[in-house]
From Swiss-Prot:
Lipid positions (S-diacylglycerol cysteine): C18
Topology class, membrane: Lipid-anchor
Annotated Gene Ontology cellular component terms: plasma membrane
Name by which UniProt lists this protein: Uncharacterized lipoprotein TP_0693
Subcellular location: Cell membrane
Native source organism of the sequence: Treponema pallidum (strain Nichols)
Coiled coil spans: none
Region spans: Disordered: 241-268
Signal peptide annotation: 1-17
Keywords, alphabetical: Cell membrane, Lipoprotein, Membrane, Palmitate, Signal
Protein's UniProt keywords contain Cell membrane: yes
The keyword rRNA-binding appears for this protein: no
Residues covalently joined to lipid (N-palmitoyl cysteine): C18
Origin superkingdom: Bacteria
Length: 440
């Protein structure tokens, strides 16, 4: 009977008097608010990852409703809208909720466990699937309605950090978006595609904190919830013990305002769902350097791929430059080691091989790949090298990933070799070293 009541309640929330679907975007800056849209990152940069927050801390309460949050600076909250599920999908979706999987999702939502609900949907919903059945269309509509209930609100944070509270809203109900995954993106070079992406994971209270990246060219960075990545990466977000400790010195540094937008989908006759995006402003004060764990024993393993797409096992240029950059930033107990099959075997096999060799002598494993995206003459007859990197950080004692990053940078030179070496040098000494110093 309780389960039936929960199912009826969720359906009444989803289908009763909901407005048309929109995109909600947020803009933040140090001096005021605007409602402009935020451009998406370059298509050449994949979704990356990662830092999170220690789950379940006492100060992570989201009892404060976004509608009543007032962080100062003349901020205001404009209530967004929740999309509807078309009537033609009701029967198929009702049949789904009568199944065991549907009942588990209903139970999870009724208890506010949004993380469990999204994980149940992971095995059932694939946004890239071409399968066109009544059930897949109903699930698609249901997921879209869930995503439209996501809201971001400012959170008190120390001067060096930004704080955000993520919630899932339906009318009068507000649930924390438990361990929701968001992508932080910022420009690191003059070229359009020169960006760094870091995935931030909210804690069990839907709260996330992160330091404002010192390497960002702009005083604003972009934070987005990716609708394509519907469910969180279990290897990162499901590990509470792997999440970084939350800073404590409170000081409000951001404010938010959503602006409803939408693009018509001519095929479906309804607005297309875009990512929830916000711009986060740098702290107005002059923050001290974010504290970094520089003394943790660390091994670096990076495999470089050349312009032909083949792995370069005879050189280790990017890893060597990264080691030099970290040593300049006063990291200690850090070194290079063999590749453990990076690029040839799954990541878990790489980690297992490293664990077998090091035992308990090394705490962190930093490993990944680099790839030459472009190496050609530019319009001014100079050579241009576009280099992409993907990096992961594994913590052996915690048995979990703590960070994932992707980055792209561009360098030019008078010769092919010069642009190539410059790109790898900058990627290691500057780009990757800066992001590790900021987020580790």
């Amino acid at each position: 009977m309780d389960r039936f009541f929960c199912t009826v309640w969720v359906w009444s929330v989803l289908f009763g008097a909901c407005t048309s679907q929109t995109r909600s975007s947020f803009s933040l800056n140090a001096d005021g608010l605007n409602s402009s849209g935020v451009a998406h990152a370059s298509e050449h940069v994949s979704h990356a990852a990662a830092m999170g927050n220690e789950a379940g801390a006492a100060d992570a309460s989201v009892s404060e409703s976004p509608a009543s949050f007032s962080p100062g600076r003349g901020s205001a909250w404009v209530q967004g809208t929740v999309g509807h599920i078309p009537a033609e999908h009701h029967a198929a979706l009702q049949a789904f909720f009568d199944t065991e999987e549907g009942m588990r999702i209903t139970d999870a939502l009724c208890t506010g466990d949004t993380y469990a609900a999204f994980n149940e949907l992971e095995a059932l919903y694939d946004p890239s699937s071409e399968t066109d059945t009544a059930r897949s269309r109903a699930l698609h509509a249901y997921v879209r309605a869930l995503l439209q209930g996501i809201r971001l609100a400012p959170r008190v944070a120390p001067p060096t950090h930004v704080g955000v509270s993520a919630t899932l809203q339906y009318r009068d109900s507000v649930w924390p978006l438990q361990r929701g995954r968001f992508t932080l993106c910022y420009q690191i070079g003059p070229e359009h595609g020169d960006v760094m992406q870091v995935t931030l994971c909210a804690d069990t209270q839907g709260v996330l904190f992160f330091p404002f990246p010192s390497a960002a060219l702009s005083q604003e960075v972009t934070l987005s919830f990716d609708t394509a990545a519907l469910v969180h990466a279990p290897s990162l977000c499901a590990q509470d013990s792997a999440l970084q400790e939350r800073p404590s010195s409170p000081e409000p540094v951001v404010s938010t305002i959503p602006s409803p937008e939408g693009e018509e989908n001519s095929a479906a006759g309804e607005p297309a769902l875009a990512n929830l995006v916000c711009r986060v402003a740098a702290p107005s004060s002059d923050p001290k350097q974010h504290p970094v764990r520089r003394q943790v024993s660390t091994t670096i393993c990076i495999l470089d791929y050349g312009k032909t797409g083949r792995p370069l096992t005879h050189e280790n240029l990017t890893a060597t430059r990264l080691l030099g950059g970290l040593l300049k930033r006063r990291f200690v107990n850090i070194g290079l080691d063999s590749l453990y099959g990076v690029g040839k075997v799954p990541d878990h096999a790489v980690i297992a091989r490293a664990r077998k060799k090091f035992g308990g002598n090394v705490r962190r494993l930093v490993f990944g790949l680099t790839q030459v995206r472009r190496l050609e003459r530019d319009s001014d007859a100079r050579w241009k090298c576009v280099l992409f990197a993907q990096l992961h950080v594994w913590d052996f004692p915690k048995g979990a990933y703590t960070h994932h990053f992707t980055a792209q940078c561009t360098e030019t030179g008078d010769t092919e070799s010069q642009s190539y070496v410059r790109a790898r040098t900058r990627m290691g000494e500057t780009v990757l070293s800066d992001v590790l110093q900021c987020f580790l």
